[in-house]
Structures are given as structure tokens and as C-alpha cells.
Amino acid sequence: MDRQTSPRDLPRAQFLAERALTTLERFLHVEAVSGIVLLVAAAVALIWANSPFAQSYHDLWHLPLSIGLGTFVYAQSLHFWVNDALMTVFFLVVGMEIRREIHEGALSKLDQAILPVAAAAGGVIVPALIYLVLNTDMVRAHGWAVPTATDIAFAVGVLALLGRSIPGNLRVFLLALAIIDDVVAVLIIAFFYSGGLDPSGFAIAALGVVMVVGLQRIGVGSAYAYVLPGAVIWVGLLVTGAHPTLAGVVLGLMTPVMSIPMREQPIDVLSRISEELRSHDAVSTKDARRLAHPRRQLRLANREMLPPVVRVQTALHPWVAYGVMPLFALANAGVSVGGVNLFAGEAHLAMLGVGLALVVGKPLGVVGATWFMVRMGWCRLPPGVSWGGILLIGLLAGIGFTMSIFIAILAFADENLLAAAKLGVLLGSSVAALLGLGWGALYVRRLRARTGAHD
């Protein structure tokens, strides 16, 4: 009987490469790491924009980049391609997260969804009101939505830093709240920051949607086949005047949550073909052609083991967390502090409004709405979640960062107001993260003390 090949029997270089790859994959899926990478990218942008090399920072993002086909050439700055094209992939992942939660997650049942929905609503309304109280001028008031967003990567990353003592239901509550926040942010962008819409673009976007539906109806499961329809939707939304990144949300919400039906279950196909291949002592060059069909079946079965929404989201997660979002932070967090005139057009009120709304408004809205729903008897706190945990969620929800900066870019045409709003986002998100870490450490200590007392 042949001895099973162990990893140690592999050539040393291959063994080391496989171990390194496995370690890297585990490292990249640690939630706290993506938040740290994002923070480093933002810090680099800030330092660069306030260094003697600040001009090179601005020159880089205004570098023209064009795509062309024949006589057609479309040229835009590198900043545009990051904010309007690459961020579509981020919104694609957001759309798929929403799709999954509606199908089988926290948003799949009304009784489970109502409390995080109420908390998210409070976390949108109260910060917006605080901002508007300080910014009554029409130009500055246009930024009311900037502090309403939550950066899910940062918030979950900070929660992960607090360790395994955090109750699982608390993490689920934060994820549900952040995803609902994403839904609200997408709706806000679509309805309030899309400007005058050109109807001609809707026909192009509709063509892309029809292409997606058509591919799904004929059973095309390869994600690559949907790149072209996605690009058509993106172009259509760009022509309409809506923000083209919404194409990612549309495509994400259309991603199937069930695998393509097969005559055999994928696991049965894998078992059958594996047995067939084992039955051959060796595969000669002449037999290679006969293996083409089994190999195709193996690839299809392996692909359909997971639903498309899970498969694509899992594949894109590292690229978004360690590529798209840090690049967005690098391109947009570089605010020249010395170049901001906080008293021109009362820009300091925009900065103060955003900062206070994130640090004070978010926890006040989240905790207040949750308390109201529980007090009225319409909801109960999830098992294992205390009011201290809800306060922690409220503080972490104040980390607006990526989405808040994104909305600020859409809200303010004035460069000085935009810079002031970005400063408010950076300062407010940093304070919210520090308060969340501080309160979270105290909360975890109390949980451990309580657990120890019961043992």
C-alpha cells in the first residue's frame, strides 16, 4: 500500500511556499489588520500632504490616465479612477453583504432586524441634526450626510482588537448596524448627491441589467462574464449623472445567493471524478485529452460548492481591504492642515459639526434609539448584550472615515470646505476609535470579572 504524502515529503521550497501562503491567507483575514492598513494609508497621506513634498502628492493624483478604443479616448485624473472606478469594487462587496444579510443574516427576519435598523436610524438622524444645528448656511448644510456613515472595516477592526471576550451577539449587532448604515449611505448618495439626472443614461444602465439577468437565466456562473455588463451599468450611471460607483451596489444586490442547479451535487461530482482518476495507475500524454472533460467537471463542481455571492465576496475581500480602501485613503486623506482656512466661509463650523456629530451624535443616536425600542417593549437586547455593549457599539459607529470622506467629496465643491470636512472626519473618527478602545477595554475587564465571579 502506497504511503500518503505528507507536507514534509514535498520539496523544501514548495513546502515553505505553501506554509508562507497559508500564513499570509490567515493574516489577511484577521479583521483588525485591514483597519490598521487603512489607518497607515491615511497617516501616510496626511504626512505626505504636509511635508516639503506636498506638491508631488497633489501632482500624483491629478496625473491624467486615459483608456481608448480606436478613435475613442476617455481621459480622467488618477484621483477620478480611484474614487469613481476602483471604489465601485468596494460598493460591489457592500451590495453583496447586504444581499447575504437579507437572505440569511441579521436582516432576514423582521424580529432580528428591527433593533439594529432602529439603532442605525438613530445613528443617522441625530448626527445629521447636530451638524445642521451648527451649519445653517445652505452651502455648509449640504454636508449634513457626512457624519451619518460608519466605516465597517475600521469599526469591526477596533472591536477585534478588544479580543475574544466580546460577546458574539455584540459583533453581529455591530455588523448589522454597519450594513444598514451602508444601505442608508447608498440611498443618500443616490437621492441627494447625484445632481441633475440625464435620462439617456438609464437606457444604457438598463441594458447592463438586462445582460446580467440574461447571463443568470442561461446559467453562466463565472464571475468574469459579468465584468462587461457591470461596466455597461457603470457607464450608464456615469452618463445619467448619478455616482457611477452605485453600479457596484446594483450588481452586488443581483448576485445569486444560490448555486447553479446541477444534475449531481458538487460534492458527489468531486467524489466520483476523484475515484475515476484514482482508478488509473498513470496518465500518459495520450490520455491527457480524455482528462479535459473531467477537469471541466471538477472546476465547475469546485466553483458551485459555494453560492456566487459568498464565492465572489470572499475572493474580492482581500483586494478591497488591502488594495482599494487603502488606495482610497491615500488619495483622499491628504489634507494640508496649513492650507485650510477654517474661518473662510465659517469652514470651522463644518469641521466642528462633523467631528461632534461623529463623537457625540452617533453614540447618542444609537443608544437612544435602542433604549426607546426596548423601553416601549417593542424589542429586547440580544442575549449576552448589555447596555455597556450598546454604548460600545455607539462609540464605534462614530468611526466614519472611508464612507464619510466619500460623501464629503460629493457634498462640497468648495475645496476649503471639503478640506475642513475631511479634517472633521479624521479627527472625529480618531476620537471615536480611541473612546471605543478605552470603553471597550473597561467593558471587557468587567465581563471577565463577572465571568470569574460566577466560576
Swiss-Prot record:
Keyword Cell membrane: yes
Membrane topology qualifier: Multi-pass membrane protein
An example Gene Ontology CC term for this record: plasma membrane
Species this protein is from: Nitrobacter winogradskyi (strain ATCC 25391 / DSM 10237 / CIP 104748 / NCIMB 11846 / Nb-255)
Residue ranges crossing the lipid bilayer per the database entry: 27-47, 53-73, 114-134, 143-163, 172-192, 195-215, 242-262, 320-340, 349-369, 390-410, 424-444
HAMAP family: NhaA
Lineage: Bacteria, Pseudomonadati, Pseudomonadota, Alphaproteobacteria, Hyphomicrobiales
Recorded GO MF terms: sodium:proton antiporter activity
Family the UniProt entry places it in: Belongs to the NhaA Na(+)/H(+) (TC 2.A.33) antiporter family.
One Pfam short name: Na_H_antiport_1
Reactions catalysed: Na(+)(in) + 2 H(+)(out) = Na(+)(out) + 2 H(+)(in)
Name of this chain's protein: Na(+)/H(+) antiporter NhaA
A biological process term (GO) from this entry: regulation of pH
